[in-house]
Amino acid sequence: FRKADVGIKDGKFALIAEPGCLPEAERTIDAGGKYVLPGGIDTHVHYRDPGHWERETFEVGTRAAAAGGCTTFFEHPISMPPQWNGEIFLHLCICKGEESAANDRHEKGSCVDFCFFGAAGGEHPEAIEPLSHEGIIAYKTFLHEAPEGRDAEFEGLTSANNDQLYR
């Protein structure tokens, strides 16, 4: 750790400099004696939204992430339904920048940056590759059957045997 001045432009870190080397600013915050750290990235979250709002909603989960210093998260599929095809992904978990009711809800509900994993199980292998063009960053596959009574949460997400896995 070292002492430094931090320049912010448009809400983002723009420059880290030796103390006293930054130009005059509109606003100055004295953070002397404090640590300034980059935001954390949580690469594995399941918000269960939609489908199990009683467990955690997108809005509540992202606020908790921000409170803990996390500025980016990667959402993994286990919602109802999980994002195993482009239609579900675009309807439920659409990437930033697209216009839709789902995107508005997620954009307005999140106070941190986010991206999504897609489901890549053995039930719908034809949907895996096209999903990559919709904006997901990676795939998730469970190598077991859906737990009893939870088939809807795991649709398109499991490859419980080698036949499914190697298709």
Residue ranges and their predicted role:
Residues 28, 41, 139:
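Receiver (REC) domain switch-region micro-motif
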Residues 1-38:
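Histidine-rich, glycine-flanked metal-binding segment
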